[in-house]
């Protein structure tokens, strides 16, 4: 294979805390093993998470030069795996914002999906830390980013890129207002 794009993993802090050994084995050790098997000509495009930034800074958005300070096992395994990948000469890493979009197996633990579920079920929402910001990216934009990386690999290689939508860097309160447009009885 010319390109290796590892997408398997245990995703999210709650699941990784519940299945610690599996999280380390799948999110970190499997990536380490995969990188060790690559030929010098092969190229790897890795998908990390913006969870590696931890809580970040309240004054500014995190960029690729922001310090990595993961606060969960999930974030730590992804950061450590990225370090391994980026030691490989032919590598690119995307630090993904929270991915959203239709799935056959919807994750109701994700903030956006959880807010929609609660609003449909309970017809009301109690918002904790309403000014907390999250950045989002649609799954089709992630796919477009990976395709772009394949076609522009030599220009992008050996670098890390945040992949998210500027317009989707919103507070919980702003998110609830958007949900309210579609769920009238909220």
Regions found by a protein language model. Name each.
Residues 22-24, 60, 66, 71-79, ...:
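Short-chain dehydrogenase/reductase
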Residues 119-123, 127-186:
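C-terminal substrate-binding subdomain of Rossmann-fold SDR/epimerase-dehydratase oxidoreductases
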Residues 1-25:
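NAD(P)H-binding glycine-rich loop region in Rossmannoid oxidoreductase-like domains
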Residues 6, 32-73:
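Conserved Rossmann-fold NAD(P)-dependent oxidoreductase catalytic core, especially the SDR/UDP-sugar
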Residues 48-49, 82-103:
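Conserved beta-loop-beta element that borders a ligand/cofactor-binding pocket
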Residues 55-58, 69-92, 120-121:
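Active-site Tyr-X1-5-Lys
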